[in-house]
UniProtKB/Swiss-Prot annotation:
Primary site of residence: cytoplasm
All residue ranges annotated as the Nudix hydrolase domain in the record: 90-256
Motif (Nudix box): 128-172
Name of the protein in question: Isopentenyl-diphosphate delta-isomerase
Pathway: Isoprenoid biosynthesis; dimethylallyl diphosphate biosynthesis; dimethylallyl diphosphate from isopentenyl diphosphate: step 1/1
InterPro entries in the record: IsopentenylPP_isomerase_typ1, NUDIX_hydrolase-like_dom_sf, NUDIX_hydrolase_dom
Active site: C127, E206
Role of this protein: Isopentenyl-diphosphate delta-isomerase; part of the second module of ergosterol biosynthesis pathway that includes the middle steps of the pathway. IDI1 catalyzes the 1,3-allylic rearrangement of isopentenyl (IPP) to its highly electrophilic allylic isomer, dimethylallyl diphosphate (DMAPP). The second module is carried out in the vacuole and involves the formation of farnesyl diphosphate, which is also an important intermediate in the biosynthesis of ubiquinone, dolichol, heme and prenylated proteins.
Species annotation: Candida albicans (strain SC5314 / ATCC MYA-2876)
Binding site for substrate: K77, R111, K115, S128
Enzyme class: isomerase
Cofactor: Mg(2+)
GO cellular component, one term: cytoplasm
Length: 284
């Protein structure tokens, strides 16, 4: 049975979302706008004590969605991650990369202390957001009147483009070590979580595209320490030991994915097709 929160999100029409959040730029008006909004000094108390580069990145434009993962428009990363907006039903698109080397070990990262949300937490290889631009929506031209943005194949294509970009940005993994054609899309996860305790001003509410990437052992990793505090390759057994260590904190989406899916995928890295689906798994 759907949670009350899921029912709230499902009840919001495209027009409801645009009315409730007038800061969201409708999809038909997006062509030609920059990849990020201009500097916004409102709610400056939200950023007190935070890193300037991470504040700048909060103006990137995420893909605002309806309950069925259909793009509605562009909203800043800040808008999409304010907990009051999340509690009112604002939803956006994300992706999570799980990179495995030839030995079947998973590359984990610990998020940097500078991060505004989920700082210092261990998580999967890379988790971020496609930008609300044609290439990361999976279409090649103007968005005005385009129905192509509602096509799952195109959305997956856009998520892979974004994943390649962010692997380079966060971990210094060059494009040639993470070619688009090597990403395997499996499914989508819908979840919500505050960043920290329930009193947090920040959080996540995403439909998360799961991407598996199998690479050689000798790929280049050159971490951007404004994004990543630490990284390591682990076996499944080593990850389970990490989960037993109370001194380590993990992102909520990573824990949810591990509890429901990851270890089944890990046991079948050479036979992932059996896990592919077009569902949105609601973990709300």
């Amino acid at each position: 049975m759907s949670s009350e929160y899921a029912k709230l999100v499902a009840s919001l029409s495209n027009q409801d979302i645009l009315t409730k959040w007038p800061e969201v730029t409708p999809l038909k008006k997006i062509s030609g706008i920059p990849r990020s909004a201009g500097s916004d000094s409102s709610d400056s108390d939200l950023f007190d004590g935070h890193d300037e580069e991470q504040i700048r990145l909060m103006e990137e434009l995420c893909i605002v969605l309806d309950y069925d993962d259909k793009p509605v428009g562009a909203g800043t990363k800040k808008l999409c991650h304010i907990m009051d907006n999340i509690n009112a039903g604002l939803l956006h698109r994300a992706f999570s990369v799980f990179l495995f080397n030839e030995d079947g070990k998973l590359l984990l990262q610990q998020r940097a202390d500078e991060k505004i949300t989920f700082a210092n937490m261990w998580t999967n290889t890379c988790c971020s957001h496609p930008l609300c631009v044609p290439s990361e929506l999976g279409v090649d031209s103007s968005l005005e009147g385009s129905k192509d943005v509602n096509n799952l194949t195109n959305a997956v294509k856009g998520a892979k483009v974004a994943a390649q970009r962010k692997l380079e940005h966060e971990l210094g993994i060059p494009f040639e070590d993470a070619p688009i054609e090597n990403f395997t899309y499996l499914t989508r996860i819908h979840y919500k979580s505050p960043s920290g305790d329930e009193s947090s001003k920040w959080g996540e509410h995403e439909i998360d595209y799961i991407l598996i990437l199998k690479t050689k052992n000798d790929i280049t990793v050159n971490a951007n320490y404004n994004e990543v505090r630490d990284f390591k390759y682990v076996s499944a057994d080593e990850l389970k030991v990490m989960f037993e260590d109370d001194s380590l904190v993990f992102t909520p989406w990573f824990k949810l994915i591990c509890q429901s899916f990851l270890f089944k995928w890990w046991d079948n890295l050479d036979n992932l097709d059996q896990f592919k689906d077009e569902e949105i798994h609601r973990l709300l």
